[in-house]
């Protein structure tokens, strides 16, 4: 029975990870397979007064076949200078933007040979008010902050990129901003130096592990934090001024969740630190950026002494969901958005487990039953859809973030776990 169950698990994982991958390649509208990125070096200089930012970018890439063109995702970007270097020569690129498709084609006179190449770009972008890309928000006192929200297809609004989940690369981020403003990103700070202007400082961050562009994150503003740790991993909970003590419960929850996940998974948390920030202006409930999770304030900050049990449950479960994404989605990522259920379904299935161990009196196992029933009801409607569904455009991709990708996918995983047994299923998950 044990061996048979393991065989079933293996076949199911193969179907999820292989057959659906072939399906997404067949149907999805993608960047041409001309080159792949290896690394990005990015410098951002936000200007809060003009609602703009200056950007400078160097992309190290590998050209796959001879070509005179490289296509990047790009939206709301004003290019100032673009060059491509290859085989010892540097050429100015001619640009052909396509606003409808949100791409730009970089053309050079001398074809690029297969092998390494470097794209260098100077540009400006918009600190928009649309809560996507690189945008401006305000706290209750009217103080501005700049923050990113890139999932699913909005990294291209902050820097020209291979803005698809399959194109993983490392990122080196530098931010030049006002000397009194804090800067947070995915990795640890490596330096914080005054200048170049008299009222500025320049903050540099360590090279990230390879990751998808939608997981890059930056926040710049008047922020403060409380801090702790779990399994020697530093954890900080950030807020706008005057609210840092409201992060104590979230910090405690994150410490508990980190310890649970490090025991559950065969790979311990791989990112060195975890920052979490609650923002007044944030469109999503939360976003699982690698090593730096962003939240809507109400889903991270609360008064531990006076908050209801339901409010605490909501915060704890959202934290557990986003931290589960550090493995499901960040470390292991779907090839294309057709399979977003693999990200969201696994994180939703996982979210109650550490909280049930930490707070058994909350009976989150009963909540799982209720959630499964709600998913069954939703899936009985005439307008339901398959878990795996093709999506080509940004608008179609956004539509996939629904109750099917979260609730139904999690319900299917709970069913498989129940059939195979928790330990067999866990062993299969750890082999993905």
Tell where the protein language model's regions lie, with residue ranges.
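N-terminal secretory signal peptides that target proteins for export/translocation
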Residues: 1-10
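Compositionally biased non-globular segments, especially hydrophobic aliphatic-rich helices
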Residues: 7-8, 21-26
């Amino acid at each position: 029975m044990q061996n048979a169950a393991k065989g079933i698990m293996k076949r199911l994982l193969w179907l999820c990870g292989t057959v659906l991958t072939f399906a997404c390649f067949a149907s999805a509208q993608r960047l041409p397979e001309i080159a792949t990125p290896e690394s990005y070096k990015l410098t951002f200089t936000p200007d809060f007064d003009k609602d703009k930012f200056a950007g400078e970018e160097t992309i190290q890439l590998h050209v796959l076949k001879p070509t005179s063109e490289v296509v990047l995702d790009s939206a709301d970007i004003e290019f100032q200078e673009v060059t491509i270097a290859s085989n010892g020569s540097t050429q100015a690129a001619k640009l052909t933007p396509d606003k409808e498709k949100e791409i730009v084609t970089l053309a050079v006179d001398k074809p690029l040979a297969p092998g390494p190449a470097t794209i260098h770009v100077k540009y400006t972008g918009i600190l928009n008010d649309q809560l996507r890309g690189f945008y401006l928000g305000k706290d209750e006192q009217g103080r501005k902050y700049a923050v990113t929200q890139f999932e699913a297809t909005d990294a291209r609004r902050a820097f020209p990129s291979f803005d698809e989940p399959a194109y993983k690369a490392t990122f080196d981020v530098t931010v030049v901003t006002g000397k009194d403003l804090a800067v947070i990103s995915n990795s640890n700070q490596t330096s914080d130096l005054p200048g170049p202007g008299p009222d500025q400082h320049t903050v540099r961050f360590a090279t990230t592990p390879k990751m998808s562009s939608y997981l890059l994150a930056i926040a710049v503003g008047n922020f403060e934090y409380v801090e702790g740790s779990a399994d020697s991993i530093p954890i900080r909970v950030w807020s706008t001024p005057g609210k840092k003590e409201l992060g104590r419960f979230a910090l405690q929850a994150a410490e508990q969740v980190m310890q649970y996940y490090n025991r559950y998974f065969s790979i311990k948390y791989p990112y060195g630190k975890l920052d979490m920030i609650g923002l007044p202006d944030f469109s999503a409930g939360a976003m699982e950026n690698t090593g730096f999770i962003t939240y809507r304030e109400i889903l991270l900050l609360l008064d531990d002494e006076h908050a209801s049990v339901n409010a605490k449950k909501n915060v704890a479960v959202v934290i557990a969901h986003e931290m589960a994404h550090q493995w499901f989605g960040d470390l292991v990522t779907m090839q294309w958005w057709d399979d977003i259920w693999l990200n969201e379904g696994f994180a939703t299935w996982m979210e109650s487990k550490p909280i049930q161990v930490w707070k058994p009196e909350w009976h989150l196992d009963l909540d799982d039953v209720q959630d499964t029933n709600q998913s069954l009801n939703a899936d009985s409607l005439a307008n339901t859809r398959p878990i795996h569904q093709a999506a080509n455009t940004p608008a179609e991709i956004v539509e996939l973030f629904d109750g099917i990708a979260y609730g139904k996918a999690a319900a299917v995983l709970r069913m498989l776990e129940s059939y195979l047994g928790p330990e067999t299923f866990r062993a299969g998950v750890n082999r993905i």
